[in-house]
A protein has these predicted regions:
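Phosphate-group recognition and catalysis centered on beta-loop-alpha active-site segments
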Residues: 1-178
Length: 180
């Protein structure tokens, strides 16, 4: 148990894929609403694109949550940014949460939003498998976090507390063996 965890006086509440009951999951609007609602943390699912960018999507295919089709791994981040990831939910996005064209997020985009929250916030990153890039996903997530200033000893990036999760035993072992 960390010092942060032992000092808790109440349960922490995490918004799964952002405020996904209100807005399309993993979108700028969903995460901004979760922060506005007072979530103690947010959960995101990550995949790698063809150009090795870490993007926030639950499914490995684009069909359910965008106007695109096919595997996420076969697209570049620039190609994904051209797709509509919010209309499928059928909800109008308030102006303050940005236009539809800015709803798709990369991990660095989410980190910027969480830093701007101005308070301590948790981030639970789920590494999605199977991935055609196998454990390169874990390596790229760690590279992105380190480039942003993440401290592996405390698992903090400024005001952001970072945790990892995965259904993949290989992912869990890989993260444990490299001592993050």
């Amino acid at each position: 148990m960390t010092a942060d965890e032992s000092a808790l006086t109440r349960p922490l509440v995490y918004a799964h894929r952002g405020a996904s009951a209100d807005f399309a999951e993993h979108t700028r609007a969903a995460y901004l609403r979760a922060l506005a609602d007072g979530a103690d943390g947010v959960e995101c699912d990550v995949h790698l694109t063809r150009d090795q960018q870490v993007v926030l999507l639950h499914d490995s295919n684009l069909d359910r949550t965008s106007d695109g089709t096919g595997p996420v791994a076969e697209r570049t981040v620039d190609q994904l940014r051209l797709l509509d990831f919010s209309s499928w939910k059928g909800v109008r996005i308030p102006e303050a949460y940005g236009p539809r064209s800015e709803q798709f997020l990369t991990l660095p985009d989410l980190l910027d939003m969480l830093r701007a929250a101005g308070r301590d916030i948790g981030l639970a990153i789920e590494l999605k498998h199977p991935s055609p890039y196998q454990l390169k996903l874990e390596d790229r997530v760690l590279e992105v976090l380190r480039a942003e200033g993440w401290d592996a000893e405390t698992s903090r990036l400024g005001n952001i507390r970072v945790t990892f999760m995965s259904f993949s035993p290989d992912s869990v072992r890989h993260l444990s063996l490299i001592h993050i």
